[in-house]
Amino acid sequence: MIILKNANIVGVRNGTIVNGSIGINGDKIAFVDYIDYNNHNNDNIYNKNENTQEIRRKQRFNTRSEAPVKIIDLKGKFVCPTFIDAHIHIESSHITPSEFEKYALKYGVSKVIIDPHEIANVVGVNGIKFMLNDAKLLDVYCMVPSCVPATELETNGAPITSKDIEELFKQNNYRILGLGEVMNYIGVINKDKNIIDKINMAKKYNKLIDGHAPQLTREDLINYVNMGIMSDHECTTEDEALEKLQLGLKLMVREGTASKNIYLLKIIDILKRKGTYNKLFKNIMLVSDDISVKDLKEGYLINTLKKAVKYVSPIEAIQMITINPANYFGLDMEIKPDNYADLIIFDDLEEFKINSVIIKGKFLNELNKYNKNNNIKNNKNNNDNLINKSINYNYKTENDFLIDGIDGGGAPISTNSKVRIIEPIGSSLITNEIMLNIDDAKTKLKNNEINRIFVLERHRNTNKIGKGLIKYLKTGTIASSYAHDSHNVIVIGNNLKDIAIAVNHLKDMGGGFVAVKDGKIIEQVKLNMGGIMGADGEYIYKKINDIENKTKNWSIIENNNLFLSMSFLSLSVIPNLKITDFGLIKNNKIVNLVEL
């Protein structure tokens, strides 16, 4: 038994901090005593020399009297439950769950609710099963992907059908909690049979239903919510967040690597002024959604807490990654008897400096849980289906990347023709559409003020290439096989030779990232598991840092994470102008690059 005495215990349900002690027996919390050690004679409380006290405790909790009791005086350090990341795509960190957990546990994250639609878009149901079972200590729960592919306007590797979803729900796996983010909100509003069948399947098995409704408002939002959607993580304005909360949605405030919306916590003051705080605060959570391996390794949710306390109290910040998501997902994340002893010991609640992490009753630094050779062996044995034949297109030439109307060819073009340009907006996933006169577009393309962007279908060798123009790079060419949600190959650049080199090198690597300039490969990151992940976290962390550092001056957009931001340019369910292997997509419709 371990007794943590003189602890400031964070009560996440009531928002309190009370001095006391916590007893840990095996992997569970045995007792919690609220004793103010600052105003109590400590000599008789859990004194190592007080054998009577030890025996009494052992008898009470049915432990053998000869078993040792380890008493640790925390001297007022703060103890709170470990954290939940309530909505995350682990694949965005480009490492497997067994690698992800090494960093997550270090920063006190013991539970994650994943929506593995990234790997599902590549290899289908097998990818979901892999993501659920790969981690060893991290508690991985799953929302089954609802929109694979995200829309019918792109080509993915394998669909997830209503039948697939029912088979997963029927397994009665306690870690399968519901239906993942319903991105096809237009289909929901228009009662598209395919997505409605999936929603009804979740209702049939009493599962939760996560939402995805960027900029959806008023009647459309009401219709969306009325179909049974329960949460949303796509808010970007305070009005949007308040409207969704008032309609009963759980609000997931996202603070990821590409999209940063923690400023939405300003609404908590509004709730307090309106007198609705007590009713609605419990429905607010902090989530990552998509996080890079760099941000994962360098702080994860601890960094999110540090940002959150600019808007809320430390306890409120902690509640949004413990009790609030726990209540939504039906989990138990309090410090109370019979719960698992998953605890974080903090030196303070200002900088959130972690002293220790306890997982299932054991201090993290004492757990001999990672045998590197076994991890590599297990990944290899279990995941050959994720590794081989990931990039399935023929080698490309410069001619494959000529654009009708820009490089000649196609229908006759008048000097009054307009060209659509994709314009990313800072750290937002939303893009603008710019219309340029065709001659102006050609001039800007020649001067590297705008770039070519292509999406190559890579799963079924259909030879489809979506073609467009974008305001993104000052120089160089970048390409990636990680591009939401179907993870076709996306490439941006101006030099046709470099573009061909980049996509052909990705094929040879089996997937990943590559940067090319003046005919030379500047840097690369190999992601040979479905073209989106790898099994060596330290390698991927180093190589992603290397490629980001070598390309950081290439971006037109200040402080832009080039590869992560690029990965969302093909996510056509996010407004306004995106690109898939079908071409340019606007408002869920294919639009022409050149308007005659």
Curated annotation (Swiss-Prot):
Its EC number(s): 3.5.4.2
Reactions catalysed, as given in the entry: adenine + H2O + H(+) = hypoxanthine + NH4(+)
Keyword match Hydrolase: yes
EC class (word): hydrolase
Family: Belongs to the metallo-dependent hydrolases superfamily. Adenine deaminase family.
Designated name of the protein: Adenine deaminase
Gene Ontology terms for molecular function: adenine deaminase activity
BP GO terms, sorted: adenine catabolic process
Keywords on record: Hydrolase, Manganese
Source organism: Methanococcus aeolicus (strain ATCC BAA-1280 / DSM 17508 / OCM 812 / Nankai-3)
SUPFAM superfamilies in UniProt: Composite domain of metallo-dependent hydrolases, Metallo-dependent hydrolases
Necessary cofactors: Mn(2+)
InterPro entries (alphabetical): Adenine_deam (IPR006679), Adenine_deam_C (IPR026912), Amidohydro-rel (IPR006680), Metal-dep_hydrolase_composite (IPR011059), Metal_Hydrolase (IPR032466)
Keyword Disulfide bond included in the entry's annotation: no
